[in-house]
């Protein structure tokens, strides 16, 4: 999968498509970068200049002579029962890998921040006030059945996603009109001006074949884009579904006559003949499958396993390679997240008390071998993270919402409580109890009760047995406060359904953030999204100050303003204690059977970029064990 802004943002849906640029030559004059004055251009950047000129041959980080062929066996956790990306996050469990089939208008470069180049679109233009954007499709873009990709397909895709996906409904809420404005042109009109992001994020739209979705299947039944389906989808991308067993495996094969194989942003990518995803119940089972050479490549998210589980013969014999890749392209909030739609979590003092009870330091020592850092920002590890006390432009922005935010955020830096030794634990539990009493609770007969005498009971909902260890470690600290705690583990299908309907108290959730946040923040934290089932506002935040700051982020006129506005948003979210932050690690941990090659210089913002820019190495494969 290629890491893109959208794939970072959409944890529950499919990632953006793999890249491309034209086989049909365009003049440099026609695609000059220029100012935003209606000039056709080959790429877009939110801030600053783009790196690659109109006539570039390929991205610098790829191997243009990469060998072709071979198969990659990859892992997926849980199950799947759906190939329809439109209803992802709303209905069913989406199959892994569908980003290989579906393409977008534009595609990002992995060595630039917030820069995209043409994929299905050969060129893009917008007026100086950014009140609209027009994309011109490539004349040679084709669906796998040979039919051309048309503006009607783009219009159909936009209307379908916006009507049926909470994510896209929020993401594209400022688009008021979409119309065909030329034989190969499609224009999106916005309800305002000055939104720097809108012309670019429209290019992230996955494009679907209108004629296929409005047709019938092999049994003569009319397809319904609003429902789940296990019929392999028609796409325009470099791969198509070869075979699938619902809930167990799905295999993709390279499209022999793929229209975009010679595009310059595709050179050096899509090198494998086949890709296969095998499904496992949880990460522990998947690890054993990897050890048994049933999986080729694994991303390891558990510090304990990274430290202890990779001491097996194939690692010692260098047949399995462990390698870490720096994470520079995303900030991440991973946390215990409250459902503040429920009365017991509406008071921020209650939520803050839960943070005082979380002994991260001891958990890090016992469970994670000291590998992790505590998260202290929704944009952890980036220049967007709030630090210290607000100053300069950030302070000026916060003054506009001064009466709607906690006063402490102006004079105190946000910090998580530090535990780890008996005295600290005792002091923090005492502070937690003080906060709970201020919120109207008291301890009676070892139970925490509210003013009505009702006991505080919470359920920690998880979807993988591996998470049970984490929540069971947290549970005794909460019980020491008199809180009744239950832990419930459900399968992925049940878990998704409960989240869509907000049927939970506390979950482990994560929100990936790009280096250029924007419209998606409405879906994460905006008041309107709080009432939309299936939205990413899992917490249920309805906060006027947050809404105001989200709009300031979206309509920032410079990188400086964007950074300051995002820091302000981050600070307000932190000081409302909507979550108990967990932990992070600044590298992507990977393990692979030594059958593959990758470029010597990896893209700065691509992490491992597997399998996008990797290839099958016949010489290495010959020395590796024969696959089972």
Q: Where do the PLM segments sit?
A:
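Extracellular/periplasmic solute-recognition and catalytic clefts
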Residues: 177-180, 242-253, 278-342, 349-353, ...
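Ligand-site clamp/hinge motif
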Residues: 138, 227, 258-310, 352, ...
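N-terminal lobe/hinge region of extracytoplasmic solute-binding protein
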Residues: 34-129, 156-159, 234
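Surface-exposed binding/hinge segments that line
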Residues: 136, 170-218, 236-245, 389-402
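Gly/Pro-rich hinge or "lid" segments in bacterial periplasmic/extracellular proteins
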Residues: 96-114, 159, 203-276, 281-285, ...
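Aromatic- and charge-enriched surface segment that lines or borders ligand/interaction sites
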Residues: 62, 66, 89-96, 123-167, ...
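Aromatic-rich, solvent-exposed beta-strand/loop patch
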Residues: 118-122, 144, 149, 189-210, ...
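Detector for C-terminal structural segments
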Residues: 8, 14-15, 26, 35, ...
């Amino acid at each position: 999968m290629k890491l893109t802004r959208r794939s970072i943002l959409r944890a529950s849906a499919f990632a953006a498509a793999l890249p491309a640029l034209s086989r049909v030559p365009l003049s440099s004059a026609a695609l000059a970068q220029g100012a935003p004055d209606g000039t056709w251009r080959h790429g877009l950047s939110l801030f600053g200049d783009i790196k690659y000129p109109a006539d570039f041959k390929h991205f610098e980080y790829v191997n243009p002579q990469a060998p072709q062929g071979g198969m990659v066996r990859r892992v997926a956790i849980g199950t799947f029962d759906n190939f329809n990306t439109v209803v992802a996050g709303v209905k069913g469990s989406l199959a892994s890998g569908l980003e290989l089939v579906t393409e977008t208008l534009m595609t990002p470069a992995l060595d630039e921040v917030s820069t995209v180049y043409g994929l299905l679109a050969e060129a893009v233009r917008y007026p100086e006030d950014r009140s609209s954007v027009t994309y011109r499709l490539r004349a040679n873009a084709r669906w796998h059945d040979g039919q051309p990709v048309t503006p009607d397909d783009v219009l159909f895709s936009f209307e379908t996603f916006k009507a049926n996906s909470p994510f896209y409904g929020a993401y594209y809420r400022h688009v008021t009109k979409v119309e065909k404005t030329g034989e190969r042109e499609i224009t999106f009109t916005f309800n305002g001006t000055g939104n720097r992001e809108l012309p670019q994020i429209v290019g992230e739209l996955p494009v679907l074949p209108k004629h296929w979705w409005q047709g019938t299947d092999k049994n003569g039944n009319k397809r319904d884009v609003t429902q789940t389906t296990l019929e392999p989808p028609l796409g325009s991308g470099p791969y198509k579904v070869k075979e699938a067993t619902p809930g167990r495996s799905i295999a993709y094969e390279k499209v022999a006559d793929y229209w975009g194989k010679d595009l310059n942003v595709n050179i050096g990518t899509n090198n494998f003949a086949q890709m296969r995803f095998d499904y496992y119940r949880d990460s522990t089972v998947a690890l054993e499958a990897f050890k048994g050479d049933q999986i080729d490549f694994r991303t390891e998210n558990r510090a304990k396993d990274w430290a202890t589980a990779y001491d097996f013969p194939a690692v010692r014999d260098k047949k399995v390679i462990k390698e870490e890749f720096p994470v520079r392209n995303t900030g991440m909030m991973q946390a215990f997240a409250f459902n503040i739609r429920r009365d017991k979590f509406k008071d921020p003092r209650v939520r803050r008390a839960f943070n005082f009870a979380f002994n991260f330091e001891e958990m890090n020592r016992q469970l994670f071998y000291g590998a992790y850092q505590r998260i202290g920002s929704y944009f952890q590890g980036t220049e967007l993270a709030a630090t210290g006390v607000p100053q300069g432009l950030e302070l000026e922005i916060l003054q506009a919402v001064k009466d709607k935010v906690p006063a402490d955020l102006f004079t105190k830096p946000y910090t998580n409580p530090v535990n780890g030794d008996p005295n600290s634990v005792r002091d923090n539990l005492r502070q937690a109890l003080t906060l709970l009493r201020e919120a109207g609770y008291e301890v009676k007969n070892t139970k925490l009760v509210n003013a009505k005498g009702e006991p505080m009971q919470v359920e920690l909902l998880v979807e993988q047995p591996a998470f049970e260890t984490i929540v069971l470690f947290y549970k005794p600290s909460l019980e020491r406060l008199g809180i009744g705690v239950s832990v419930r583990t459900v399968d992925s299908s049940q878990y998704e359904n409960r989240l869509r309907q907000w049927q939970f108290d506390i979950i482990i959730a994560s929100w990936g953030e790009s280096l250029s946040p924007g419209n998606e923040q409405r879906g994460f934290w905006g008041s309107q999204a709080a009432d939309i089932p299936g939205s990413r506002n899992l917490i249920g935040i309805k906060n006027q100050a947050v809404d105001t700051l989200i709009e300031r982020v979206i309509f920032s006129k410079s990188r400086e303003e964007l950074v300051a506005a995002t820091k302000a948003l981050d600070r307000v979210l932190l000081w409302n204690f909507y979550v108990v932050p967990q932990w992070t690690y600044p590298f992507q941990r990977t393990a692979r059977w030594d059958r593959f090659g990758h470029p010597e210089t990896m893209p700065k913002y691509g992490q491992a970029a597997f399998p996008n820019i990797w290839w099958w190495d016949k010489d290495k494969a010959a020395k590796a064990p024969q696959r089972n």
